């Protein structure tokens, strides 16, 4: 591996990613991909998202509006872009990686009430911007091992010109002034639309976007030109001239075949080389060993497997972003392409509906969610799959639905969750003791669930222990309800096994059927998808995809469960690329 080139020691560098013209240009993926490139050059990189909405966090936001809530190890409910950061950087981030306007104003108002401003008139400048700056600069603090990041990449949410983003942009401008221009870099993402009638690419939106950014005191150092095709050199030269950006900093980023190709696109345009030169960073050549192996698995699969995701929020795929990425990573482990079948849970309430939706799939995933809508459909999908030996993986609410279905199968006909039916005679899923006030409306809903990483102990001979190759694991959680221990013995009569619990044995963390009864029907109260990486697939997802591939390869029996079938777990080994 090439050694780092020697340069004088410098302070942590700050790189800000902004966006203009329209939203959804891929600022998060651009920043994540650049972070991956800098990491592959031997640099320590961390990332942060500044969100301009007034919510304190996305924990209580509608999934149809916001997408998934990404939970960090320390229990913060954050924006889904933080998931991209973790997956591309292959490192865990904390709650400080996501800052919202709601957090900033809450903190400033609390300080004012405590008298910390000593009678000052509290204003956006300096008090709000100072609070934002303190969150940005805090990202440069040493980690638990004493290592200070070389680069902090901060994505500023929203679009330049939006009133909500102005305090964050002003704070970023002030950071550049305070840490020094040589230690700060602004990367602006803009749209270059193609006008089909005239057959032209238009640069005027980008010029106007940069003009708006310059009007508030920020001159971008580089431009990411988003387009459905390559931007010709002549247009790049024009944009460089009109926007006063070095030609080396004008980066064409046409649509890529997959999100994992974006680092290659940026590297081809030499953005990473330009950044390390401008910031005078120590660096080595990019080590592509791991990423090239990933891209080979992405683009050259040996086989295909079809997975049904039976969910409530399928109209917005971002509501299940980490789940779908974890499934794809599980496929990469087996050199397989995962085809997603999006199934509305309501469609599976009747066995005929489940048969129509699931007849030609190789596995069923039941993701998390809240509320009663679609629950009977999730349970119906589990019942259909259980009777046919179809592999199932249930996450959080998915585990609870597996337990309800098992209870009903042994005659507990009223089995339900206290969440869906508070008056149920058989609450096999009950409210956690410390969550009752929140459920009753007597405490805040936001930030009060069982959140973050918790340990679990697995039974040695279980499917999940073989998948993890361990009996002590830690996973991230986000829930208020748990398996009711009073029903464990009766539910076990169905053959469902409580194969993992909290260390004290009180809280059920994993359930499964023995392989002799079903090849792979596993549920976890956790959200293991949050810890999956494209280069290090989560073992539970890799095992699930392995079982689905086995199911596809075997003769499908319409009703009878096969006596023996490999569950794919024994295939799990550390691939050379996982490092």
Swiss-Prot record:
Pfam family name, one: GATase
Binding locations of Mg(2+): 81, 155
Regulation: Allosterically activated by GTP, when glutamine is the substrate; GTP has no effect on the reaction when ammonia is the substrate. The allosteric effector GTP functions by stabilizing the protein conformation that binds the tetrahedral intermediate(s) formed during glutamine hydrolysis. Inhibited by the product CTP, via allosteric rather than competitive inhibition.
Chain positions recorded as ATP binding sites: 24-29, 81
Catalytic activity: UTP + L-glutamine + ATP + H2O = CTP + L-glutamate + ADP + phosphate + 2 H(+); L-glutamine + H2O = L-glutamate + NH4(+); UTP + NH4(+) + ATP = CTP + ADP + phosphate + 2 H(+)
One cellular-component annotation, GO: cytosol
Region (Amidoligase domain): 1-281
Residues the record lists as binding CTP: 23, 162-164, 202-207, 238
Residue positions binding L-glutamine: 369, 397-400, 419, 480
Domain Glutamine amidotransferase type-1: 306-554
List of catalytic residues: 396, 527, 529
Keyword annotations from UniProtKB, A to Z: ATP-binding, Glutamine amidotransferase, Ligase, Magnesium, Metal-binding, Nucleotide-binding, Pyrimidine biosynthesis
Gene3D superfamilies according to UniProt: 3.40.50.880, P-loop containing nucleotide triphosphate hydrolases (3.40.50.300)
EC numbers on record: 6.3.4.2
CDD domains xrefs: CTPS_N (cd03113), GATase1_CTP_Synthase (cd01746)
Quaternary assembly: Homotetramer.
Family as reported in the entry's similarity comment: Belongs to the CTP synthase family.
Protein name: CTP synthase
Lineage, uppermost ranks: Bacteria, Bacillati, Actinomycetota, Actinomycetes, Mycobacteriales
